[in-house]
Amino acid sequence: MIDFGNFYQLIAKNNLQHWLNCLPAQLQEWQKAALHGNFKSWVKTLENLPEISPTQLDLKNGVIAERDPPLSAGEKICLTNILRIFMPWRKGPFSLYGINIDTEWRSDWKWDRVLPHISPLTGRTILDVGCGSGYHLWRMVGEGAELAVGIDPTQLFLCQFEAVRKLLGNDQRAHLLPLGIEQLPALAAFDTVFSMGVLYHRRSPLDHLWQLKNQLISDGELILESLVVEGDEHTCLIPGERYAQMRNVYFIPSAKMVKIWLEKCGFVDVKIVDQAVTATEEQRRTDWMKTESLSDFLDPTDSNKTIEGYPAPLRAILIARKP
């Protein structure tokens, strides 16, 4: 099983220590709950990963680990085959000892859009909600974060994260917990909170914004990234059963409406800092994610529309502060 003991020891010494009142019991319950059918085999695969520590680690320009001397051809083949057991790899990319995990999403492109607009992360304690396999956690560490905590209930993402961590020399500056935001108490302990690609999956988006606010310290910063539609502050798309083949999409507001939602929840200094159409080069099928991707979800005769006839994915980034 996954051992969270190092994380407990870490937060016992900082301003997250009150989380220990409930977190160990929650994760113990998670360990007993209905796990994914492949979870035990994924954990066994994790145990079979070789112990490797990088002689060069670059988390500033990517998630890039290298070793001198490099892996032999046979070692690379063996490691590649192990990492492929964790497919599909959706968020990345990762470059690990000459093995390039070309993920479905170019999450580095999103990071490049976000980074110029946020407060410096040096020395900060950070929460990333819906963090996927933790790619952005490592980039936060690369920007000097003291501790980057991700939450995501998807068990494959947890195993992918732990695989990468093991190949980064068991780095303890980032941690992923298999929880949803609704399972967190109001910690009020994070300097920065990220919620990227989550809001439109929530049945009650304002409740989600309140939950994010409750995790921040006073004067803490929220980075919110979401699907949006063009329009004024009164515009919101409520799609039918599917949007771009996704079932669980409830509200896609305009960026101006999201700004009003944030202000209604008590955030201040709210700014829309970026808005960009998602290109098929940013989300696509790869050798590490071989099922359908964005190009399959768009109208084949008009790439400005989804296959259901809605506006094609447009994403906005907003920055806000908790007073």
UniProtKB/Swiss-Prot annotation:
| Taxonomy, superkingdom | Bacteria
Gene (name only): cmoB
Outline the subunit composition: Homotetramer.
Listed PANTHER family: METHYLTRANSFERASE (PTHR43464), TRNA U34 CARBOXYMETHYLTRANSFERASE (PTHR43464:SF95)
**Assigned keywords, A-Z:** Transferase, tRNA processing
Q: Which reactions fall under this protein's catalytic activity? A: carboxy-S-adenosyl-L-methionine + 5-hydroxyuridine(34) in tRNA = 5-carboxymethoxyuridine(34) in tRNA + S-adenosyl-L-homocysteine + H(+)
Instruction: State what protein this is by name.
Output: tRNA U34 carboxymethyltransferase
GO molecular function (one)? transferase activity, transferring alkyl or aryl (other than methyl) groups
One Pfam family, please name it: Methyltransf_9
Please provide the Gene Ontology terms (biological process) for this protein: tRNA wobble uridine modification
What does the record give as EC number? 2.5.1.-
Functional summary from the UniProt entry = Catalyzes carboxymethyl transfer from carboxy-S-adenosyl-L-methionine (Cx-SAM) to 5-hydroxyuridine (ho5U) to form 5-carboxymethoxyuridine (cmo5U) at position 34 in tRNAs.
CDD domains per record: AdoMet_MTases (cd02440)
Stored InterPro entries:
CmoB (IPR010017), Mo5U34_MeTrfas-like (IPR027555), SAM-dependent_MTases_sf (IPR029063)
Is the keyword tRNA processing assigned to this protein? Answer: yes
User: Where would one find coiled-coil regions in this protein?
Assistant: none
Per the record, the similarity remark reads:
Belongs to the class I-like SAM-binding methyltransferase superfamily. CmoB family.
Q: Where does carboxy-S-adenosyl-L-methionine bind?
A: 91, 105, 110, 130, 152-154, 181-182, 196, 200, 315
